Regions:
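Hydrophobic alpha-helical segments within soluble ligand-binding/sensing domains
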Residues: 168-197, 237-242, 296-317
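Flexible loop/turn connectors
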Residues: 15, 243-348
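Flexible loop/hinge segments that line or gate small-molecule binding clefts
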Residues: 134-179, 281-292
Length: 348
């Protein structure tokens, strides 16, 4: 390919290489001409060319691409694969990285005998410039470390979700707050009159309390009769749910990660005949109830957005912990499934 470009532009292959990599030694006019000819010939950008052309559609493949490191946690190397939401994060990241001329390689932070210091050195010695931190797998509480102590001065870095408290990195997240409001609005439009929220405390911590914050905002507006006190359980127990349910008698439940769904099923309630159910992450409930109503978090778009942020930081030469971290929030979409129905519009 270098020879073809050199023949078309009338300069040496060395000059073509310098121009494609944005190095000194060629004039700006020559560089622009080389990039134009390269694009016409269907040259696939490696990350160096992406710095100059930002997002060329490719027609031919090259043997070598640059790597972005995906840092995962959990009990095993493949723990993250148990969750459809996280698989979609990674799928979205892979697809977007490929468009930029990168590939994504997983590095397990809990590898036996591995320290984060050593892992950072391994990534750096590989010439990897960009790091993506996947959501931390450990159950979160005030007693669990939520830090990733890597030498971030070596890399550009971004986080997917918001499970890491330190460092405060640029991150791509789902807009959990707006999704709760959207779920409440949709259930209200279906004429549900008493809508309850049931969450495991650790899961609400993973989103920094945004679900409960949004619910309480609407509770303040709509009143306690329509939105009873949320049931936030440090340790999910059926008896606690039964007491709460018997007291407030909701006709719809919002929950996530199959928690409220399992409570309703164990209680023997018909869904949606006796009570409606909406998930804050339909992918998380899909194993138990494949056609559940609720929020599609568009997790593949979150993963793609993380790569967008990371490649932009690499291209600008931004490494280390940012002084002012940036956030990209991706809105969810309501998915109407079989766990909710349109109810008669009766006066309460």
């Amino acid at each position: 390919m270098l020879r073809e470009i050199a023949d078309r532009t009338g300069i040496s292959r060395m000059a073509v290489s310098l121009a494609l990599r944005g190095k000194s030694g060629v004039s700006e006019t020559t560089r622009k001409n080389v990039l134009k000819v390269a694009q016409e010939l269907g040259y696939e950008p490696d990350p160096e060319v992406a710095r100059l052309l930002s997002h060329i559609r490719v027609k031919k493949s090259v043997d070598t691409k640059a790597c972005l490191a995906l840092l995962t946690s959990g009990a095993t190397h493949q723990s993250w694969k148990r969750y459809l939401t996280e698989r979609k994060y990674v799928e979205g990241a892979h697809a977007r990285a490929k468009e930029y001329g990168y590939y994504v390689e997983q590095f397990w932070m809990n590898e036996p005998g591995m320290t984060l210091s050593r892992l950072g050195n391994i990534i750096w010695s590989r010439g990897i410039e960009g790091v993506i931190i996947a959501p931390l797998q450990s159950k979160l509480s005030g007693k669990v470390s939520r830090s990733v102590r890597l030498d971030f001065n070596l890399f550009s870095a971004v986080e997917i979700s918001e499970t890491v408290e330190w460092p405060d990195l640029n991150r791509a997240v789902h807009d959990q707050y707006t999704s709760m409001l959207k779920a409440l609005d949709e259930l209200s439009a279906l004429n549900y009159k008493t809508i309850g929220l049931v969450l495991e405390e650790a899961l609400d911590l993973r989103v920094n309390g945004k679900w409960t914050a949004a619910y309480l905002r609407y509770r303040n507006q709509w009143g306690a009769k329509r939105l009873p006190p949320p049931l936030i359980l440090p340790f999910p127990k059926q008896p606690a749910f039964n007491r709460w349910f018997d007291h407030y008698r909701p006709d719809a439940i919002i929950s996530v990660d199959r928690l409220g769904l399992r409570f309703l099923i164990k209680r023997g309630l018909n869904i949606p005949g006796e009570v409606g159910y909406a998930s804050l992450d339909v992918d998380g409930d899909a194993e138990d109830y494949p056609d559940v109503s609720g929020i599609d978090q568009n997790s593949d778009i979150v993963g793609a957005a993380a790569v967008d942020m990371l490649v932009a930081a690499i291209n600008r030469g931004q490494r280390g912990i940012p002084v002012h971290a940036l956030r990209t929030e991706v809105e969810g979409s309501w998915r109407q499934g079989k766990s909710t129905v349109k109810k008669p519009n009766t006066v309460s």
